[in-house]
A protein has these predicted regions:
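Glycine-rich, proline-tolerant flexible connector loops at the mouths of alpha/beta enzymes
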Residues: 32-43, 89-109
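Conserved alpha/beta-domain cores
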Residues: 7, 71-80, 89, 107, ...
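Alpha-helix-loop-beta-strand connector modules within alpha/beta enzyme cores
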Residues: 46-61, 103-130
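Extreme N-terminal starter segment of soluble prokaryotic enzymes
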Residues: 1-4
Length: 133
């Protein structure tokens, strides 16, 4: 059985990930990140994720609302060497839900299905998962 460090906004930085690995975590997540940041401001995304010299496996959780942007961001993350890509479909935080992301995606299951299908087409090597509450 594998042990995962979950993505925690404000906490899952490089230091915590290294500590959790030292204590036996098999897979560690970065903090969740907006797909728009990965696409439009890749330097900022790399700085936030701190995965340049990361040990593997490394996992990233994406949030967003547009299938085209989420799938493009997933492709970019895979090219950066990310081993696991997770779609956030559970975050109840008001500003995430207001942007039609996180748990708001559950309001329109056909749209969610479209997102999943498009992301799967872009992800070739990384493992894909969905966070839901």
């Amino acid at each position: 059985m594998k042990t995962f460090l979950a993505p925690m906004a404000g906490y899952s930085d490089r230091v915590l990930r290294d500590i959790c690995r030292d204590f036996g975590a098999d897979v560690v997540f970065t903090e969740m990140i907006n797909c728009n940041t990965v696409i439009n401001v890749p330097e900022k995304a790399k700085e936030l994720l701190q995965i340049e010299k990361e040990k593997h496996p490394i996992a990233v959780q994406l949030f967003g609302s547009k299938s085209s942007l989420l799938s493009e961001a997933a492709s970019i993350l895979e090219n950066w060497g990310v081993d696991y890509i997770d779609l956030n479909v559970g975050c109840p935080v008001k500003k995430i839900v207001k942007a039609n992301a996180g748990s708001a995606l559950l309001k329109n299951l056909s749209h969610l299905e479209d997102i999943i299908v498009k992301m799967r087409k872009e992800i070739n090597k990384a493992k894909f998962s969905i966070k839901i509450r």
